């Protein structure tokens, strides 16, 4: 039984390690973004504010399922007969809630909110992951946009 619990735990940790928030940074492009034409504009940073980017609730499903399975296994080791069934169900519910919480915490990443006055006079706000590049007010930046997403980089 211990081997099963250990195997399920390792599988859950392996899946959790697959979370990748690097594409939220202005320093990283996905494979589908490479070699794509992007419109470029220029601007100046007006204000910089650190923010926290929370992954979507849909991504917490893996944590909830993994936690429920692990909790069910652990609950199944308690008691016998009806007590075992109740412990299995309670363990699955508690494990699911705990697993979702752990996955939610893992999906948080440090970001930066950039208020940018574009050279055309418009002011925009962009939130992206805080990568290796540090931004500051007054800094000139280049904005690369594919129509639905924009990436801010130093000029």
From Swiss-Prot:
Record keywords: Cell outer membrane, Lipoprotein, Membrane, Palmitate, Signal
Topology within the bilayer: Lipid-anchor
Keyword Coiled coil: no
Annotated lipid attachment (S-diacylglycerol cysteine): 18
Signal peptide: 1-17
The protein's name: Outer membrane lipoprotein SlyB
Coiled-coil blocks: none
An annotated GO cellular component: cell outer membrane
Record InterPro entries: Bact_OM_lipoprot/Surf_antigen, Gly_zipper_2TM_dom
Main localisation: membrane
Gene (UniProt): slyB
Lineage: Bacteria, Pseudomonadati, Pseudomonadota, Gammaproteobacteria, Enterobacterales
Lipidation (N-palmitoyl cysteine): 18
Family, per entry: Belongs to the Pcp/SlyB lipoprotein family.
Superkingdom classification of source: Bacteria
Keyword Lipoprotein: yes
PROSITE patterns: PROKAR_LIPOPROTEIN
Stored Pfam families: Rick_17kDa_Anti (PF05433)
Compartments, record wording: Cell outer membrane
Organism: Salmonella typhimurium (strain LT2 / SGSC1412 / ATCC 700720)
